[in-house]
Regions:
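ABC-family P-loop ATPase nucleotide-binding domain
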Residues: 1-13, 223-234
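ABC family nucleotide-binding domain
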Residues: 2-216
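H-loop (His-switch) and adjacent beta-strand-loop-beta switch element
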Residues: 213-225
């Protein structure tokens, strides 16, 4: 299967020169369409920097990043913004919902920037909320929902436009164990429908929910293995 994401020898260097810091140091990674991959590492490992690269929130100092066949590693800010809007659905630890908007309005908001008509925006948003089990909460504002429900709204917002990549950064970090389990089950169900899911975490138990685990340490990929076959793929 051709790679949806292909990173070639990527480095991210801060303070070049005598006191330089290599947050990423020669990272190579391929992710195929439809994979469910967990990227795990402790604080300072480089996982957040790698997430920023994968999400087109930053560009590498060296190396190339191909997303859906396009080299995004040298794109300007406006072009990267367009890629983020069309190619990637983000789920963050903080739900990032607008308090004054209802659930369906929060889900609709990013679709406006894609130039989608009002009728289609509503249809896509309602469908996304149904997928995450919140059809009964569409007209509720964030303050009227639990943390787990708010994160489900955030997932609906990420998937509404059907982007090729779902990028989830510590999506259970602010949730209790019950809500965390619900969110992980939703991500698994999304993967079963053929969506590409990339989960960023520091937690081994959460990483174990993915089909593939990529461990990063000191800016390098330390391990890359399948959860149902622990033999390293490197």
């Amino acid at each position: 299967m051709p790679a949806l994401i292909e990173i070639e020898d990527i480095c991210k260097v801060y303070n070049p020169g005598e006191n330089e810091v290599r947050a990423l140091d020669g990272v190579n990674l391929k992710i195929s369409k439809g994979e469910f991959v967990a990227i795990i590492g402790q604080s300072g490992s480089g996982k957040s920097t790698l997430m920023n690269m994968l999400g087109c929130l930053d560009v590498p100092s060296f190396g190339q990043y191909f997303l859906n066949g396009r080299d995004v590693s040298t794109m300007k800010d406006d072009d990267l913004s367009d890629v983020r809007n069309k190619e990637i659905g983000f789920i963050f630890q903080g739900f990032n919902l607008i308090p004054s908007l209802t659930a369906v309005e929060n889900v609709e908001l990013p679709l406006i920037y894609r130039g989608i008509s009002k009728e289609e925006r509503k249809e896509l948003s309602v469908k996304a909320l149904e997928i995450v089990g919140l059809s009964h909460r569409m007209d509720h504002k964030p303050a009227e929902m639990s943390g787990g429900q708010q994160q489900r709204v955030a997932i609906a917002r990420a998937i509404a436009a059907k982007p090729p990549v779902i990028l989830a950064d510590e999506p259970t970090g602010n949730l209790d164990s019950h809500s965390s389990k619900e969110i992980l089950e939703i991500l698994k169900e999304l993967h079963k429908t053929g969506r590409t899911v990339i989960l960023i975490t520091h937690d081994n138990d959460i990483a174990a929910q993915a089909k593939r685990v990529v461990r990063i340490k000191d800016g390098k990929i330390e391990q890359d293995y399948l959860n149902d076959d622990t033999e390293s793929t490197k």
